[in-house]
């Protein structure tokens, strides 16, 4: 990389750090081009990204954005995965890492909190924001459905009693 290109590259990483509340730092040593392309496509469909970064430039960008605490995570062939939705991204990366042993999760940052590999794996087990919204809607609708059922039960029972009485006569 030319010296004149480095400030632009640092700027790109700074923008990712500023615009993405969730970042996972990975080691991609041993992944094939097709595997990286597959991961990128999967991430892109979920409005996330995968960027191979030069460690020194990623460290400079981290210091410029006040994320000094993640600078020590950059060593070896490193790539960052970034997204606005942390759970979906974590699920995708953890599942990809399980199926492709050459992708290693090193750590990350979610809402300015540094996470280790274990924390990211635990994050991937949580329900996504959309799943939580669906559960809340279901919980709000469930009582009303039960109330309707309870209110209808006496009239149905009364109708059965009357029908039974009418059939006897």
Curated annotation (Swiss-Prot):
It comes from the Bacteria. GO terms for molecular function: large ribosomal subunit rRNA binding; structural constituent of ribosome. Pfam families: Ribosomal_L10. One of its GO terms (biological process) is translation. The keyword RNA-binding applies. InterPro entries: Ribosomal_uL10 (IPR001790), Ribosomal_uL10-like_sf (IPR043141), Ribosomal_uL10_bac (IPR022973), Ribosomal_uL10_bac_type (IPR047865), Ribosomal_uL10_CS_bac (IPR002363). GO terms for cellular component: large ribosomal subunit. Belongs to the universal ribosomal protein uL10 family. Part of the ribosomal stalk of the 50S ribosomal subunit. The N-terminus interacts with L11 and the large rRNA to form the base of the stalk. The C-terminus forms an elongated spine to which L12 dimers bind in a sequential fashion forming a multimeric L10(L12)X complex. Forms part of the ribosomal stalk, playing a central role in the interaction of the ribosome with GTP-bound translation factors. This is Large ribosomal subunit protein uL10.
């Amino acid at each position: 990389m030319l010296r004149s290109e480095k400030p632009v590259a640092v700027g790109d990483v700074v923008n990712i750090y500023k615009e993405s509340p969730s970042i996972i730092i990975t080691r991609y040593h041993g992944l094939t081009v097709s595997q990286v392309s597959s991961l990128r496509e999967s991430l892109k469909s979920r409005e996330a990204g995968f960027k191979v970064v030069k460690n020194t430039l990623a460290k400079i960008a981290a210091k410029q954005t006040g994320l000094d605490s993640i600078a020590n995570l950059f060593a070896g062939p490193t790539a960052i995965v970034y997204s606005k939705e942390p759970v979906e991204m974590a699920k995708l990366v953890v599942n990809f890492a399980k199926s492709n042993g050459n992708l290693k999760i090193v750590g990350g940052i979610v809402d300015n909190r540094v996470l280790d590999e274990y924390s990211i794996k635990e994050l991937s087990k949580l329900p996504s924001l959309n799943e939580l919204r669906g559960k809340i809607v279901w919980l709000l609708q469930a009582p009303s459905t039960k109330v309707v059922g309870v209110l209808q039960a006496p009239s149905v029972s009364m109708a059965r009693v009357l029908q039974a009485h009418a059939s006897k006569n």
